[in-house]
Amino acid sequence: MKGSFLATGYPWRALPTLDFYLGIFRDVFPLSKAIRRCGSAALDLAYTAAGVYDGFFEFRLSPWDIGAGILMVREAGGIVSDLDGGDGSFASGNVVAGGPAVHRELLAIIRRHASEQAIERVNPLQAASPEPVTP
């Protein structure tokens, strides 16, 4: 994974995931060339499939954000898994993707930081709405 170009998304729905992400960043950042966020998990996965990124990880995603991207990465010969290394990304919303070597190392780092609370999927249709802004 040394020198890899990675992509991820940042937690925006729940602050408990922030510590989870920061722990991963502390371990991944020194090993990677760069970590980017384009704003779309679908695009990040497409770039991973195309070889622009060497790997991608993000959690608590919705099926419509990852369905096509999972297929693209797999068709390109990459590996996509959930945090258990299994085939449950679509159901769990947790995605780790990349070529075999990057995927293996990235998954090991993420699993060291994983906790049930940090990666529990949030249904965006039931997520708490932000407080209204009053002038």
What kind of feature is each model-predicted range?
Residues M1-P135:
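An extended, acidic
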